[in-house]
């Protein structure tokens, strides 16, 4: 077997088994070789004793036979033979006893050796099993080693590949870094050019607005001059005497002369506002309604052309007027080319602003029970989402889907500021009470505080959720979010003062005139009033048909805080009584699509609602 396995094709495990068997044969043969040889000698002695015993037995029989056949005189000799035989028998008996004793000892030794051999055989069998197990383990380990060698080779190849890829990526990174640096430089150059072009475009828009303003003023002066040339008949009454408050009442003729001087002096003045006031007072009792209408319209245009916004003084005593729920729709108009998202009255109630998906803010004069288009504010690159006037009505702030907020002056339609910095669409922007700062909330889950003096963002607060609407007090900003929470922020510390969680996504917020109650609308189709002093929900409004149409559906308090108004998804306008919590009135025929926003004039005389279908409706109780 060993000779057959010495060739180069013989497996290593066969050689190992052959060597182990030869080693075991040597070790066990040396241990038992002497014992086996002694056992053989004892067997030979036993056989010899048997032969001797047989021989002696034969001799005994022969002696007896001879003794029986021998004659009498030989008796002495027979006695001697008998004695010899007895002695030999005793001797042989002793030898036989000793042999039996040795045989017993040898048998015991053989038994013990057999036991040892059996034990050794068991040990050999156990060792063979261990050897087989070890051989199997060795084979498994060799297989595992081979697998590990293969894996090591694969890892080395992969490592080499990764090194090559790393070198290639490093080269690519260096090239991209150079490209990025070059692109950054190009971008800076493009931004500079873009800013210059934007400045030129703004200057062009401002120039066009300036031309429009000059044309309007020239047309107004021409109309006023024509109106002043027309012959008029009037009596000396209180209106004429108003122009002569500084003249001495010496008589009718002196008064008439003073009046003539006053009129000529006013006609010679270049100030359009003073001339307009004089003409309006003079023709207050005119019999020409068309002239009166032109004069009135001209007066409105002239007043709205000043930054001080005399629109605020158009409705004296409006705050003392009792607010009533509108009774009917008095005027319907197409506000924009597409969806209308926002609507707001100016502080004087005479000017209405609407914002839509056509990227424009449109201004409307509310004259009687009509809305007349006055102009539009351009510059936004996406749909308008929110509109806000400052407290004087001179500036208009609009948030847009192009990640920016913009400020225009109302009198000349000029774009004054563009506030960029959000990374998502801006859903709400509001003036703080000082009108020098602005807060904007965006879909990027941040709120930003802007300083209009420095035209920069001075604070950014991460709210953690998309902001849908904002309202402000002196030192607190309240924001409504997509995660169903209303957060109260301290402007000075940028910290959340408290949170109020509702059952649906917040779509709109509004404050009552005393700023003690917070109105909120959510996507669970509930409108709630929260008492800011008690930090608890005070009143909940709902209706069987009311359903919030979108995440930016706006709700509003009435100017005196007695009523709440909101539009539904199916186009119904609702009015609730704050004290009773019940529906005061509802209108369902004017809108054919979801109402997005509602505005209540500060004078309390009009309400405007706008919807997704580009329609605006003017409501009144007259």
Curated annotation (Swiss-Prot):
What is the protein name for this chain? Autophagy-related protein 16
SMART domains according to UniProt: WD40
- The residues forming a coiled coil are 93-230
Among InterPro entries, the record links this protein to:
ATG16, Autophagy-rel_prot_16_dom, G-protein_beta_WD-40_rep, WD40/YVTN_repeat-like_dom_sf, WD40_repeat_CS, WD40_repeat_dom_sf, WD40_rpt
WD repeats (start-end): 335-374, 379-418, 421-460, 462-499, 501-540, 547-588, 590-622
List the PANTHER family: AUTOPHAGY PROTEIN 16-LIKE (PTHR19878), AUTOPHAGY-RELATED PROTEIN 16-1 (PTHR19878:SF6)
Q: Where is the region WIPI2-binding?
A: 207-230
Signal sequence span per UniProt? none
User: Where is the region Disordered?
Assistant: 59-78, 244-271, 287-320
Q: Where is the composition biased (Polar residues)?
A: 259-270
Q: Give the matching Pfam families.
A: ATG16, WD40
Q: Which Gene Ontology terms of cellular component type are present?
A: phagophore assembly site membrane
UniProt keyword Nucleotide-binding present: no
* Disulphide bridges: none
Q: Which GO terms describe its biological process?
A: autophagosome assembly; protein transport
Keywords noted in UniProt: Autophagy, Coiled coil, Cytoplasm, Membrane, Protein transport, Repeat, Transport, WD repeat
High-level lineage: Eukaryota, Metazoa, Chordata, Craniata, Vertebrata
């Amino acid at each position: 077997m060993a000779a057959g396995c010495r060739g180069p094709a013989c497996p290593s495990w066969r050689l190992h088994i052959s060597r182990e068997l030869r080693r075991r044969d040597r070790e066990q043969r040396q241990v038992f070789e002497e014992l086996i040889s002694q056992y053989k000698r004892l067997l030979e002695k036993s056989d010899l004793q048997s032969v001797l015993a047989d021989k002696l037995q034969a001799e005994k029989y022969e002696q007896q036979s001879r003794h029986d056949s021998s004659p009498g005189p030989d008796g002495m000799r027979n006695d001697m033979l008998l004695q010899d035989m007895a002695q030999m028998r005793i001797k042989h008996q002793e030898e036989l006893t000793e042999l039996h004793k040795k045989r017993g000892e040898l048998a015991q030794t053989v038994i013990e050796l057999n036991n040892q051999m059996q034990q050794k055989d068991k040990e050999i069998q156990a060792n063979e099993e261990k050897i087989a197990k070890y051989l199997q383990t060795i084979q498994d380990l060799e297989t595992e080693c081979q697998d590990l060698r293969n894996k090591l080779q694969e890892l080395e190849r992969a490592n080499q590949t990764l090194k090559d890829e790393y070198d290639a990526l490093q080269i690519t990174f260096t090239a991209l870094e150079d490209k990025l640096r070059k692109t950054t430089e190009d971008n800076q150059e493009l931004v500079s050019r873009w800013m210059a072009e934007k400045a030129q475009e703004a200057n062009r828009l401002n120039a066009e607005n300036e031309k429009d303003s000059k044309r309007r003023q020239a047309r107004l002066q021409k109309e006023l001059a024509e109106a002043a040339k027309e012959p008029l008949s009037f009596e000396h009454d209180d209106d004429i005497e108003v122009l002569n408050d500084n003249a001495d009442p010496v008589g009718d003729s002196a008064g008439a002369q003073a009046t003539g001087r006053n009129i000529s002096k006013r006609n010679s003045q270049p100030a359009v506002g003073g001339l307009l006031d004089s003409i309006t007072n003079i023709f207050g009792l005119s019999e020409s309604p068309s002239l009166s209408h032109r004069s009135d319209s001209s007066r409105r245009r002239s007043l709205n052309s000043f930054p001080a916004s005399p629109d605020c003084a158009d409705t004296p005593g409006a705050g003392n007027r009792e607010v009533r729920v509108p009774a009917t729709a008095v005027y319907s108009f197409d506000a924009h080319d597409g969806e209308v998202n926002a609507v707001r009255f100016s502080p004087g109630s005479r000017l209405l602003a609407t914002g839509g998906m056509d990227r424009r803010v449109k201004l409307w004069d509310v004259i009687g029970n009509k809305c007349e288009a006055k102009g539009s504010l351009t510059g936004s690159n996406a749909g308008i989402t929110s509109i806000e006037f400052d407290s004087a009505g001179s500036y208009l702030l609009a948030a847009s889907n192009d990640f920016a907020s913009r400020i225009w002056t109302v009198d000349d339609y000029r774009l004054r500021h563009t506030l960029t910095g959000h990374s998502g669409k801006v859903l709400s922007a509001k003036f703080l009470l000082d009108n020098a700062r602005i807060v904007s909330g965006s879909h990027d889950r941040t709120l930003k505080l802007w300083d209009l003096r420095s035209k920069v963002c001075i604070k950014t607060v991460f709210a953690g959720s998309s902001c849908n609407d904002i309202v402000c007090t002196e030192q607190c900003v309240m924001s409504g979010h997509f995660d169903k929470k209303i957060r109260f922020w301290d402007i000075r510390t940028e910290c959340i003062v408290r949170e109020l969680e509702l059952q649906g996504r917040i779509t709109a917020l509004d404050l009552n005139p005393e700023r003690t109650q917070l109105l909120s609308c959510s996507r669970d189709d509930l409108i709630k009033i929260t008492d800011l002093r008690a930090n608890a929900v005070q009143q909940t409004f709902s209706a069987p048909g009311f359903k919030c149409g979108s995440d930016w559906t706006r709700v509003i308090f009435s100017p005196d805080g007695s009523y709440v108004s909101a539009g539904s998804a199916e186009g119904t306008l609702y009015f609730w009584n704050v004290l009773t919590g019940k529906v005061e009135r509802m209108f369902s025929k004017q809108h054919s699509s979801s109402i997005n926003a509602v505005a209540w004039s500060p004078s309390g005389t009009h309400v405007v609602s706008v919807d997704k279908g580009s329609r605006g409706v003017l409501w009144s109780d007259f």
